[in-house]
Every structure is written in structure tokens, then in C-alpha cells.
């Protein structure tokens, strides 16, 4: 209590506090020689994105995966798709250096939402279409009727863009509220496919009632990608040790504790992918 007002710690532990209480259930025992900087990414960020394709919504070998947002969370999902053996991994992000970086981690195609405009959903559907319109001839739909449209799209879509709370110093999002991106992620998911919403939007999202009811798509909640910390984090440590997960190159800048304010500013400016504050 502070002057009679209840005070709650951020995320239940108070990660931005000078003093915090680490409850036992928040502690995960790890036995590794990996650098602390890499292990910090397993508290959220990289681990949450990777879990998007391996915990709740599980990517499948040969599947079509789309990731909206190439920040640390989205790049975790890209790596999950690569490790799974996805057929193609399409990354959507307005920032060029992030699109280019995603190609190094497993993306096969990148799209600029500002350049694609309202045609981005159809562009993704075409990329996921297959060689023809006949399923028994290697295509992805039963014919040219309405089913042919809703059957085209990605098997798995991860929305990890989030809102743009401050004007960045790089290319801006087409919709700072992220509502449009959430709807695009839903629309480019094929009938029977899976969508995970990991980014935040503070506005109502008007999902079409017919597609919710009839197309058999599944929406997965994006709370840390379904990460089970006691089960998954030790597994991800092993994957980092084996070189399956890249937890090195995604750290694009390190800061001292005195540079914490600059770290937050750089994150808001989106001039870095992942920043790590190191204690001396």
C-alpha cells in the first residue's frame, strides 16, 4: 500500500524496480555456461516468439508460416519455423533492416506492409497458393468457388507487431493502433489454419462474424506464446547450446545500467532489435 492505495508490481514481480521480491515460482533452475546476456532473452522476447511455434500453436514441417513483426518476438517465431522445417516463412515488417535480418534467421520471403498496402493479404494468399487450384494435382483448394478463396492462405500466422506508441526513427507502421495488422493476420490465415495474436492493440477489433463461424480458423492467445517456463526454458537452453536457436545476433546493442534510459529510448525508436542492460 502507498498512502492507502494498492500498488502492484509490473508482471507480478516488478522488473523495473530497484528492489524486488523473486518468488520461488518465478525461478527456473538452469545448468549451463551460456552468457547471461543470452539467457535474458528466455524470460520473454525470444522465448515467447519461439514458443509461438512449439508450445501452444505448433508449426508443422512443410507448412506455410507468416510472421507479422520482425522484432525480438517475431524473430523468435521465425527461428521456430526454421527449426521445424516450415516450407516457407513469410515475414511482414515495415522496417527494412529488420526484414533483411529476418532472412538470416530463416525467413524465405519478406514483405513491406507500407509498399503492399491493402493488397498484402492477397499477396500472401498467392504466395501460399500452391502450383495450381486443384488439391489432387498438388494445389491447395477444391475448386474455383468460394472455397478456393478461403482455402488459400498460410497454415500458421503469428502477429507480433504490436502498437506503435511513439513515432520511430525508422519506417513507421501502416497502422499505429495495430488493429489493421491483427485483421490482416486473421484474413491471410487459410480455412482450418491457426492465428496467434501476440502484439497489443488497445482498440476493439471488428472480426467478421461469418469467417469466425464458418472457416474453422483457430485463434490462439499470445501470452508468451503459450510458454511453459519450467518445461520449455531448459529445452530452449539446450537448443541454444546446439546452435539451433540464435540468441547471439539478435542482441544488437548492450548497455550499462546508467544507460537504461537510452536503452528504452532506442527500443521506442526501433533502431535496435534487442537491447540488453548489463550489470557490472
PLM features per residue range, with description:
Residues 1-27:
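Glycine-rich phosphate/adenylate-binding loop and adjacent beta-alpha elements
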Residues 25-26, 31-122:
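Mid-domain Rossmann-like dinucleotide-binding core that forms the NAD(H)/NADP(H) cofactor-binding site
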Residues 56-61, 82-84, 100, 104-218:
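Glycine-rich cofactor phosphate-binding loops and adjacent beta1-alpha1 units
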Residues 66, 90, 194-196, 220, ...:
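Structural detector of well-ordered beta-strand residues that form the stable sheet scaffold
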Residues 94-95, 201, 225:
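Residues in the short beta-alpha loop(s) of Rossmann-like NAD(P)-binding domains
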Residues 145-147, 173, 183, 187, ...:
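C-terminal hydrophobic helical "lid"/dimerization subdomain
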Residues 191-196, 207-249:
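Rossmann-fold dehydrogenase core element
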Amino acid at each position: 500500500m502507498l498512502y492507502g492505495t494498492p500498488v502492484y508490481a509490473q508482471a507480478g514481480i516488478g522488473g523495473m524496480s530497484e528492489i524486488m521480491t523473486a518468488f520461488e515460482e518465478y525461478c527456473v533452475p538452469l545448468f549451463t555456461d551460456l552468457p547471461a546476456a543470452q539467457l535474458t532473452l528466455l524470460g520473454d522476447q525470444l522465448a515467447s516468439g519461439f514458443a509461438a511455434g512449439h508450445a501452444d500453436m505448433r508449426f508443422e514441417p512443410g507448412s506455410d508460416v507468416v510472421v507479422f513483426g520482425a522484432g525480438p518476438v517475431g524473430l523468435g517465431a521465425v527461428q521456430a519455423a526454421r527449426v521445424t522445417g516450415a516450407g516457407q516463412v513469410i515475414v511482414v515488417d515495415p522496417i527494412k533492416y529488420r526484414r533483411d535480418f529476418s532472412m538470416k534467421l530463416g525467413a524465405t520471403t519478406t514483405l513491406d506492409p507500407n509498399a503492399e498496402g491493402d493488397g498484402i493479404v492477397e499477396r500472401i494468399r498467392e504466395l501460399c497458393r500452391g502450383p495450381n487450384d486443384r488439391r489432387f494435382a498438388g494445389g491447395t483448394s477444391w475448386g474455383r468457388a468460394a472455397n478456393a478463396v478461403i482455402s488459400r492462405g498460410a497454415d500458421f500466422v503469428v502477429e507480433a507487431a504490436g502498437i506503435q506508441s511513439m513515432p520511430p526513427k525508422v519506417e513507421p507502421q501502416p497502422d499505429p493502433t495495430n488493429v489493421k495488422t491483427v485483421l490482416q493476420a486473421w484474413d491471410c490465415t487459410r480455412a482450418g489454419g491457426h492465428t496467434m495474436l501476440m502484439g497489443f492493440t488497445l482498440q476493439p477489433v471488428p472480426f467478421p462474424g461469418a469467417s469466425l463461424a464458418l472457416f474453422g480458423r483457430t485463434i490462439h492467445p499470445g501470452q508468451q506464446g503459450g510458454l511453459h517456463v519450467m518445461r520449455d526454458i531448459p529445452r530452449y537452453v539446450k537448443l541454444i547450446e546446439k546452435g539451433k536457436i540464435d540468441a547471439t545476433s539478435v542482441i544488437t546493442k548492450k548497455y550499462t545500467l546508467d544507460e537504461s534510459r537510452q536503452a528504452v529510448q532506442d527500443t521506442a525508436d526501433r533502431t535496435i532489435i534487442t537491447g540488453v542492460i548489463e550489470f557490472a
